[in-house]
């Protein structure tokens, strides 16, 4: 893993901000470059599944690395634990894309309120499912100055789930017949969900 090493040319602060619409507190880490500012800001929005603020996966922490990279280049970065994960309140399992969009916008509002952040220069970088959340947030609020989508979905969600499920099933040692049945069940459930109002 390529974790950043000190000295850091930025401050690191553990923070909490509130999604007032949902009534939950979200916990994260704010990095602000050294200097007077104001600096442009960005909220990092994670991919699918319950993610911590560093988007930790298999010993890697891509959001920690990305926050370091951006803050070393003069950008304030807020990364946060998904609702119901780590130190954040709320419930992850029942959350929808709309809920995650509101969480991201709460992060944008929090950054805009920071003295050393340029309020009109706050955007969102979304990875994977976060690449779906970022444009939803930008459509919802003019406060979002820009978006960056990293490996955002370019195909229907069910196709992503099936494509991801097959190698995961193989890696877990599941028989191919079970993996194929799981794919059929996922597609059938997606079809049922489309029919429901």
Give the positions of each predicted feature.
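N-terminal cap/lid segment of alpha/beta-hydrolase-fold proteins
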Residues: 1-37
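Short beta-strand element of the alpha/beta-hydrolase
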Residues: 38-48
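Short amphipathic alpha-helix adjacent to the substrate-entry channel of hydrolases
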Residues: 56-77
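Glycine-rich "HGGG/HGxG" loop immediately N-terminal to the catalytic nucleophile
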Residues: 78-80, 84-95
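Alpha/beta-hydrolase active-site loop
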Residues: 94-115
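Alpha/beta-hydrolase fold nucleophile elbow
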Residues: 116-128
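Short glycine-enriched nucleophile-adjacent loop
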Residues: 131-142
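Accessory cap/linker subdomain of secreted extracellular hydrolases
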Residues: 148-197
């Amino acid at each position: 893993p390529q974790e950043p090493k000190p000295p850091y040319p930025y401050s690191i602060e553990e923070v909490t901000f509130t999604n007032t619409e949902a009534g939950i507190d979200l916990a994260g880490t704010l990095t602000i470059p050294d200097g007077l500012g104001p600096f442009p800001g960005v909220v990092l929005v994670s991919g699918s599944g319950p993610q911590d603020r560093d988007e930790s996966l298999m010993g890697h922490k891509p959001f920690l690395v990305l926050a370091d990279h951006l803050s070393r280049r003069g950008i304030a970065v807020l990364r946060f634990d998904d609702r119901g994960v780590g130190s954040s309140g709320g419930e992850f399992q029942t959350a929808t894309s709309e809920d995650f969009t509101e969480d991201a916008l709460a992060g944008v509002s929090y950054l805009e309120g920071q003295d050393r952040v340029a309020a009109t220069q706050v955007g969102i970088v979304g990875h994977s499912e976060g690449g779906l959340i970022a444009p939803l947030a930008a459509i919802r609020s003019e406060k979002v100055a820009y978006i960056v989508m990293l490996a955002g979905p370019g195909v229907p969600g069910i196709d992503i789930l099936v494509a991801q499920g097959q190698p995961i099933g193989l890696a877990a040692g599941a028989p191919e017949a079970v993996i194929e049945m799981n794919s059929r069940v996922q597609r059938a459930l997606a079809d049922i969900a489309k029919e429901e109002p």
